[in-house]
Amino acid sequence: MKERYPTKKIYVGDVAVGGDAPISVQSMTYSDTRDVAATVEQINRLHFAGADMVRVAVPEMEDALALKAIKEQISLPLIADIHFNYRLALEAAKWVDCIRFNPGNIGEKSRIKEIVKACQERNLPIRVGVNAGSLEKEFDQKYGATAEGMVASAEYNIKFLEDLGFTDIKVSLKASDVDRTVDAYRMLRPKNAYPFHLGVTEAGTIFHATVKSAIGLGALLLDGIGDTMRVSITGELEEEIKVGKAILKDSGRVQEGLNIISCPTCGRIEADLVSAVAEVEKRTAHIKTPMDVSVMGCVVNAIGEAKHADVAIAYGKGSGLVMVKGEVVAKLPEGELVERFVAEVEKFAGENG
């Protein structure tokens, strides 16, 4: 795994993005933003799920005017998502912690100047959010909806902001497929030091979005690219955070929580392994201490994996072993193994957290 690219550190509210800051995970509400109660409820759900910041759509002035009441009731940093109407950004900037605008549909550059001025006055960062499906006409005509087109748009708009004396910038380059998304980020990364917001847009249902995001975001993270990220899922908000954090952990960018090793099901399994692993996941989700644990369903690989795990279950016929650091600490009936295993995990976390 490569070292992370060194990037400029900016702040979205009190959350650092870039530099040596941890890679943050964010999501976006799907409520009508003007419905303050519904939007606050969704933001609080995301906060509870572990989101570091949240973005809301601002399609109309009524939504922009609701941001004050929303901001007063939440503690997560709030990002306003702006398309088409720059005046919405001017109102939103009074209340939020960051403005995202789409350069492909915001219109004349004089409008971007007004957005920059509003953000400068309030020390707000701006995300230049380039989408392959809505490039500016000149870049679309020259490059089409390609990675090259996204990079050209981003470079042009970054320079435009820099020429105005504005450098609290983060950048995103999103397409609905992995290939263009990854190519665009890889092309742009060596050309500037601004933090990158990673994401594959319009990724689909939880199954397809998880696969696309794991491949695309995982590849970029392994390359050392990325400072904040969103997994876009057509589904429940909490799933975006859950998948995003799992990608960060399994790419090695975050050392937190359990790495659960469990065998694929086969004819040798001598226990209800699927239920056991599901229960282990549920009952240990709160643990932040990094550790490797294994839950194995037969003797073929169980002992070998247990030797390398911090805590392990090795199932046999009707009973099994609980092991800590390769040493057997209990031989128990099958129905008692998970309970003892969880107790040993919590003990290990307490001693090593």
Swiss-Prot record:
SUPFAM superfamilies in alphabetical order: Dihydropteroate synthetase-like (SSF51717), Nitrite and sulphite reductase 4Fe-4S domain-like (SSF56014)
Residues that, per the record, bind [4Fe-4S] cluster: 263, 266, 298, 305
An example Gene Ontology molecular-function term: iron ion binding
Signal sequence segment: none
GO biological process, one term: terpenoid biosynthetic process
Pathway(s) of this molecule: Isoprenoid biosynthesis; isopentenyl diphosphate biosynthesis via DXP pathway; isopentenyl diphosphate from 1-deoxy-D-xylulose 5-phosphate: step 5/6
Cofactors, names only: [4Fe-4S] cluster
Top class in the EC scheme: oxidoreductase
Cofactor note: Binds 1 [4Fe-4S] cluster.
InterPro entries linked to this entry: Dihydropteroate_synth-like_sf (IPR011005), IspG_bac (IPR016425), IspG_bac-typ (IPR004588), NO2/SO3_Rdtase_4Fe4S_sf (IPR045854)
EC id: 1.17.7.3
Keywords: 4Fe-4S, Iron, Iron-sulfur, Isoprene biosynthesis, Metal-binding, Oxidoreductase
Claim: Iron is one of the keywords in the record: yes
Transmembrane stretches, start-end: none
Catalytic activity: (2E)-4-hydroxy-3-methylbut-2-enyl diphosphate + oxidized [flavodoxin] + H2O + 2 H(+) = 2-C-methyl-D-erythritol 2,4-cyclic diphosphate + reduced [flavodoxin]
Keyword Oxidoreductase: yes
Family note: Belongs to the IspG family.
UniProt function note: Converts 2C-methyl-D-erythritol 2,4-cyclodiphosphate (ME-2,4cPP) into 1-hydroxy-2-methyl-2-(E)-butenyl 4-diphosphate.
Name of this chain's protein: 4-hydroxy-3-methylbut-2-en-1-yl diphosphate synthase (flavodoxin)
Source species of the chain: Sulfurovum sp. (strain NBC37-1)
Species classification: Bacteria, Pseudomonadati, Campylobacterota, Epsilonproteobacteria, Campylobacterales
